[in-house]
């Protein structure tokens, strides 16, 4: 076997000594034996043989066979001179320390807010601030009683009231039309998705539309009508593709502040709608045609 497999090293030989073709061949023989003995898988053997044929130094070869059992000779580098080891370890340690100090210096230069790069005590992100996490639980299932009443409460918090021209409520979002306080000829439209977003403005003729309190209806009754609407219209609940509720002013001139609620249901087999008053009184039913 080659000298790096167990024979005494000649004077001046180290892991950095250049490997010869015979050394590479010896390494490949050891790897072949390890494959036959089951120490290496086919993939490990292929990778190591490829590396052995390209090895530059004895150290490169030694690393490829150091964990293998070799009967004819130990597959490891013999002990090198202690002075050479100390020199190599010293250089590695010095390089490591230098890289750490360089990294600390760069990090302090970019992010540091202290007089020294080794002083981390004033990092504001490392100090406890006593702020508790805030978990947001806005209403999402708006066709439920809790979701519907929660939506109206969110409206009061956002605008101070529930006045408006129209409120359209989908299962997980809603839209609201309100008067522009700066110009009563304009309508401000808002969308709710966990919270009321910013307004979009549009010029509309609203002379014949009243501003009403859009919360003045029986929410519990409305939810019950929504849940029974598919069966009311002769549709299967599993066939329903969309459902939404429109709340706007009633057209009856004798009750100017009253609301009219229109519930639209659609499916692949047709759709229909219901119209009812704020107290749940049914005004009209349009069955699927």
Curated annotation (Swiss-Prot):
- Signal sequence bounds: 1-19
Localization, per the record, is:
Cell membrane
Q: Can you quote a single GO CC term?
A: plasma membrane
For this UniProt record, the keywords arranged alphabetically read as follows:
Cell membrane, Membrane, Signal, Transmembrane, Transmembrane helix
Q: Which Pfam families match?
A: DUF1707 (PF08044)
Topology term for the membrane: Multi-pass membrane protein
Membrane-spanning residues: 90-110, 257-277
Name assigned to this protein: Uncharacterized protein MT0054
Give the source species.
Mycobacterium tuberculosis (strain CDC 1551 / Oshkosh)
